Swiss-Prot record:
Disruption phenotype: Affects the expression of all the depudecin cluster genes and impairs the production of depudecin. It comes from Alternaria brassicicola. PANTHER family: TRANSCRIPTION FACTOR DOMAIN-CONTAINING PROTEIN-RELATED, ZN(II)2CYS6 TRANSCRIPTION FACTOR (EUROFUNG)-RELATED. Residues 76-130, 345-366 are annotated as: Disordered. Gene3D superfamilies: Zn(2)-C6 fungal-type DNA-binding domain. This is Depudecin biosynthesis cluster-specific transcription activator DEP6.
Length: 646
């Protein structure tokens, strides 16, 4: 094996074949690089690469450059010379004259060198029996019914739709005595490699088109992107009535409608690799038409508000948190002006308020009695509520919507949002109870989860106040009650098939961990008995294991990239993954019997694989758990890398 003249005799000149294929950094160590050694994978160096001379390499680069120049020349000559229609000219002029902060930098899939995880996600290309072994086993007194999951081994290849075998109950009550000593069968399974769909990630900035102008999209392209959105992304964030959207996009030329047309297309771009080059166009036009709504006083249009939500969501996924905060802050102020947070206030109370505030601004949405349109307005408001909670979780900024006690708007109704929907009368956020009726959807469940999480955050920041323990106990009870209310969405079938239910479950468990983390910190500050700390740690660890099991239910398939729920819900599940890693870190530091530690390490590896799947190694959430990765490496070195075959 040749070594690099610039390196040491113990390094190769080029990366190993596996690292080259994944386009990740390789330390080129001989005889086996550290990444392959960690993953227990075969490591080999192609001798052909070692024998290439500098002239051969230069020739290859020149050939690639010539092909690129030829392709650019073809694209230039193929540009249409005909005069654009008036509407498209207006879009181009608008794009060049009015801009917000600016469009993202250009996305070139081959230019981004994203770290492929040291811990690759196993794929679902294995049989269902293997998946059952991945999910592993628990102690007999663990309330998670994983026996049903292990039963999948007898149904290899069976569809998960409607299968009772996948309907395992992931619901847990703290009073049931959950045990965190969990043994995972995946500790003896090789972790199959899956390239993390790097080019589909939205954490690379996009660049503005040349000369600050935007190229418009054809109606065919827009229709294709809209279909991508409504057939995949929509179900993870369902607040737009597709029937109304389809009718208005063809019959209205208002800037609000046009802004929403491009915003929906922008969201559709996120699920298709070949559409990445259209993101810059959609993003720029969506923002420019949204700016035009303010310039031309089209503020009282639901389309404008929905466009802001989709733009803010895209910016958050792009790691442009400051920009997303401004966009969603604009949407929050618009909701206040339109009084969406009080849209279900009683007529008598509404009349009194109108008389009290008649000197204020008179901005309002057009009056309607259409129940479907009213339901769409509610879902739009709650969509903003959920997005704002993400920004606060990520940044710590203040919540910009009205305080919860001032919200007089009903929860989202069950049913697909379309023209034939008959919405149910739903309670408000403050009037919800543990009664089984009315039906609470997973989308409404996310609203309830966000309200609980915000209360937990506030209590965690007030550890010095005398009422901390009272509030902590009340929040633990409220968490138990919420699990009972949402139990129908917290089974394996729902978590596999419903992206909203998946993120709902993970965030509920993460909220549990956050509450217990606050209690652990308070215990340590007050010097309370170690038994109280151990109880909080046990509960947090149990929740972390259950997050890991839910992730195991949604392992991505290389043949169904568009159904990758982990990637689809990336913006909402990074925090739960991080909280679970922190809880398991404490368990790893504490140590214990070998079976328990093996289960902890296996879970940490799978959680890191999921986090690497949705974020770069230098991302915010990775920086929050650097101590966990360091501890895992220390454990690996101490155990000579032979305790786990992952």
């Amino acid at each position: 094996m040749r070594s690099s003249s610039a390196g040491t005799p113990f390094t190769a000149q080029y990366a190993c074949e596996i690292c080259r294929e994944r386009k990740v950094r390789c330390d080129r160590a001989l005889p086996k690089c550290r990444r392959c050694d960690r993953l227990n994978q075969p490591c080999s160096y192609n001798q052909a690469h070692q024998r290439r001379t500098r002239d051969e390499q230069l020739k290859q680069l020149q050939e690639r450059l010539a092909k690129t120049e030829a392709q650019l020349a073809m694209n230039t000559t193929a540009a249409p010379l005909s005069v654009r229609s008036q509407s498209r000219s207006e879009g181009t002029e608008l794009a060049s004259s009015t801009r917000w902060i600016g469009t993202p930098d250009s996305f070139t899939p081959n230019s981004c060198s994203r770290r492929s995880s040291q811990y690759q996600l196993p794929t679902t290309s294995t049989s269902q029996s293997q998946l059952g072994s991945v999910l592993g086993t628990t102690a007999a007194n663990t309330p998670m019914d994983l026996d049903n999951i292990r039963g999948m081994s007898a149904t290899s290849g069976m569809s998960t739709n409607g299968s009772s075998l996948f309907d395992s109950d992931l619901f847990t009550s703290f009073t049931e005595g959950a045990d965190s000593n969990m043994t995972f069968a995946w500790t003896n399974q090789p972790l199959m490699a899956l390239e993390p769909l790097d080019n589909m990630l939205l954490n690379r900035p996009q660049s503005a088109p040349p000369n600050g102008s935007e190229e418009d999209l054809s109606p065919t392209d827009l229709s294709l992107l809209h279909n991508h959105y409504f057939e995949s992304v929509y179900f993870s964030f369902p607040f737009i009535n597709r029937d109304r959207f389809t009718a208005e996009k063809t019959g209205s030329r208002s800037p609000a409608t046009t802004a929403l047309v491009y915003a929906v297309a922008l969201a559709g771009c996120t699920r298709s690799l070949q559409d990445h080059n259209r993101q810059s166009t959609c993003y720029g036009l969506a923002r420019n038409y949204a700016e035009r709504c303010e310039q031309e006083d089209h503020l009282n249009d639901l389309n404008f508000l929905q466009a802001l939500l989709l733009i803010g969501r895209f910016e958050a996924m792009n790691r442009k948190l400051e920009r997303s905060g401004l966009t969603l802050g604009r949407a929050a102020m618009l909701c206040k002006l339109l009084k969406l947070h009080q849209m279900d206030k009683s007529e008598h109370s509404q009349g009194m308020q109108n008389r009290e505030t008649q000197s204020g601004p008179r901005l309002a949405l057009p009056h309607t009695k259409d129940p479907v349109l009213l339901e769409e307005r509610r879902r739009t408001f709650w969509g903003l509520y959920i997005l704002q909670s993400y920004v606060r979780t990520r940044t710590g900024w203040e919540f910009q919507l009205e305080d919860t006690k001032n919200l007089q708007i009903n929860l989202p109704s069950p049913g697909l949002l379309r023209s034939d929907l008959e919405p149910l009368k739903m309670p408000s956020l403050l009037n919800i109870s543990t009664e089984p009726a009315p039906e609470i959807t997973s989308y409404a469940g996310c609203v309830l989860m966000v309200e609980l999480a915000l209360r937990c955050f506030d209590n965690g920041q007030k550890r010095d106040t005398p009422g901390f323990w009272d509030d902590y106990c009340a929040l633990v009870k409220k968490t138990d009650d919420l699990f009972k209310t949402l139990k129908r969405h917290l089974n394996a079938t729902s978590i596999r098939e419903d992206p909203v239910a998946f993120s709902l479950y993970l965030n509920l468990r993460a909220t549990e961990i956050f509450s217990h983390d606050s209690a652990i910190t308070k215990n340590e500050e007050q010097g309370l008995p170690p038994l109280m700390v151990a109880e909080s740690q046990r509960r947090a660890t149990t929740a972390a294991f259950q997050i890991c099991s839910a992730v195991g239910l949604n392992l991505p398939s290389p043949w169904k990239a568009d159904s990758d729920i982990i990637m689809l819900q990336a913006i909402f599940i990074a925090w739960p993954l991080t909280m679970a890693l922190k809880a398991l870190y404490r368990e790893l530091v504490r140590g214990g019997i070998r079976e328990t530690v093996n289960g902890v390490v296996a879970s940490i590896r799978l959680l890191f694989a999921a986090l690497d799947h949705i974020e770069e190694s230098d991302g915010h959430w990775h920086q929050c758990v650097t101590n966990v990765e360091a501890k895992l490496q220390e454990w690996d070195e101490k155990n000579s890398f032979d305790s786990l075959a992952l």
